[in-house]
Amino acid sequence: MKIKTTVAALSVLSVLSFGAFAADSIDAAQAQNREAIGTVSVSGVASSPMDMREMLNKKAEEKGATAYQITEARSGDTWHATAELYK
C-alpha cells in the first residue's frame, strides 16, 4: 500500500510544472503509444519526492528519452525508484 501511495504522490507531483525538464513523466495510458528504450533506477537517503523526480529526469535526459513512467518506488529512511524510458 505504501508503494501505491508513493507512486500516486509522484504522479501528482509530476503533473505540476516546476521548471523545464528534458523528459516528461507520463502515465501508463500515455506510455502505450511510445517506444520503450530502456529503464533507469535512482536511490537516495532522506530526500524529497522532487529530488527523486529530478534524478529520474537527469538520467532520462542522459539516455536520450523524451518521457518516462515510474514503474516502482519505495520510500522510508532510504528510497528507490525505477522508471521505463520512452522516445
Curated annotation (Swiss-Prot):
Pfam families: YdgH_BhsA-like. It is found in: Periplasm. The keyword Zinc does not apply. The keyword Nucleotide-binding does not apply. Keywords: Periplasm, Signal. Residues 1-22 form the signal peptide. Its main location: periplasm. InterPro entries: BhsA/McbA_stress_biofilm_assoc, Dodecin-like, Stress_YhcN-like, YdgH-like_sf, YdgH/BhsA/McbA-like_dom. GO terms for biological process: cellular response to acidic pH; cellular response to hydrogen peroxide; response to stress; single-species biofilm formation on inanimate substrate. GO terms for cellular component: periplasmic space. SUPFAM superfamilies: YdgH-like (SSF159871). Belongs to the BhsA/McbA family. This is Uncharacterized protein YhcN. The lineage of its organism: Bacteria, Pseudomonadati, Pseudomonadota, Gammaproteobacteria, Enterobacterales. The gene is yhcN.
